[in-house]
């Protein structure tokens, strides 16, 4: 398990390195706000379309080869991005990186292969910890490497490629072949009619989509808003994103596990949505950099409450026979939110107003909060 944790950490740090830089890189090459945020959408779309293919391939040739191919492809994608000289090359590099981003689902399948039921939660938690730490150190490192007066775009991207190369090396040397094999090949879409006919479960998945639609839209326009309103470059955006990552890790790493047994997932979800909504309202009102810490803390604390609690509630609400399918469809809803959210946010930023990605996100959260409050009562009555 240590090998998969170290490999994931190295790769996620690389991803985190380019996140604060990517919108500025697109603007540098003549993109408008919509084109800049669409870079997030095309990455997620490519990942969404190819994820089932990676699953079937890993069933056929094994988890380790697919993980190695994916990490190698990620390194090439970052190199391609570093060498990009126009917006078209940037788009092609991000699409290629999305296609090659099959390592996460395959790593989760690897954990399922090498652990028993008791150890699986710990293994998945280690992958989650790798993501949390990666999105603390990655943005801070990317911001630092980018510089302040003259922005160095290539160096952070080369470091990101190095992170994926380290992940490839660690996996090649330390990752052992699983003794057993849990198939990923069955399509989760066959469970969709059953999920639609289960109102509470279907509603939870719609909420999951809505949350990621709002949050991905906010993430994709944050740097653009900081550049436009607060005159911030990628260095400071990277530092602020690292702070946000710390807030998220504190919540998901400790607070959620303590609050859910006392309050239940549904109430924790409502609380998280209220935090998130407050952050979206406060963010466009900020006029000085230091005050940006407040809405970022609210947003990432809120998301830290909602995301694991919704996952847990979906898993617990689904019948055992369709639990895997329900979680698969929930992940598809997550991906669709990450595709459509940045596209809408970029359009709103460019065509309606720079604050509208956040105001519209708040408007979307209002019915989500109301539905969540109704679910609290329904779940309590069901018990």
Which residues are covered by each model-predicted region?
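Helix-to-loop junctions at the C-terminal end of transmembrane segments
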Residues: 51-61, 251-265
């Amino acid at each position: 398990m240590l090998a998969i944790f170290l490999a994931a950490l190295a790769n996620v740090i690389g991803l985190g390195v380019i996140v604060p830089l990517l919108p500025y890189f697109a603007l540098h090459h003549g993109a408008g706000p919509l084109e800049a945020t669409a870079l997030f959408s095309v990455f997620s779309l490519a990942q969404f379309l190819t994820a089932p293919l990676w699953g079937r391939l890993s069933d056929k040739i094994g988890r380790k080869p697919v993980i190695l191919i994916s990490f190698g492809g990620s390194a090439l994608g970052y190199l391609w991005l570093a060498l990009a000289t126009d917006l078209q090359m940037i788009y092609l590099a991000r699409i290629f990186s999305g296609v090659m981003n099959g390592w996460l689902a395959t790593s989760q399948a690897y954990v399922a292969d090498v652990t028993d039921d008791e150890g699986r939660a710990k293994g998945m938690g280690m992958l989650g910890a790798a993501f949390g730490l990666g999105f603390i150190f990655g943005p801070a490192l990317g911001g630092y490497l980018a510089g302040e007066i003259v922005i160095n775009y290539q160096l952070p991207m080369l470091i990101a490629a190095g992170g994926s190369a380290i992940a490839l090396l660690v996996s090649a040397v330390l990752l052992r072949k699983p003794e057993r094999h849990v198939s990923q090949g069955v399509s989760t879409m066959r469970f969709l009619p059953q999920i639609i006919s289960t109102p509470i479960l279907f509603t939870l998945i719609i909420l999951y989509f809505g949350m990621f639609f709002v949050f991905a839209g906010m993430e994709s326009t944050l740097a653009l808003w900081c550049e436009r309103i607060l005159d911030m470059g990628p260095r400071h955006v990277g530092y602020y994103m690292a702070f946000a990552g710390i807030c998220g890790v504190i919540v998901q790493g400790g607070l959620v596990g303590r609050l859910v047994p006392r309050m239940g997932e549904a109430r924790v979800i409502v609380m998280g949505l209220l935090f998130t909504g407050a952050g979206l309202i406060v963010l466009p009102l900020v006029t000085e950099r230091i005050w940006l810490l407040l809405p970022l803390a609210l947003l990432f604390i809120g998301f830290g409450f909602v995301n694991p609690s919704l996952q847990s509630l979906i898993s617990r609400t689904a019948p055992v026979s369709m639990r895997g399918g329900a979680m698969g469809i929930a992940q598809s809803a997550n991906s669709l939110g990450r595709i459509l959210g940045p596209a809408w946010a970029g359009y709103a930023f460019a065509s309606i107003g720079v604050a509208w990605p956040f105001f519209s996100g708040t408007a979307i959260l209002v019915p989500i909060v109301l539905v969540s409050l109704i679910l609290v009562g329904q779940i309590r009555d069901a018990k």
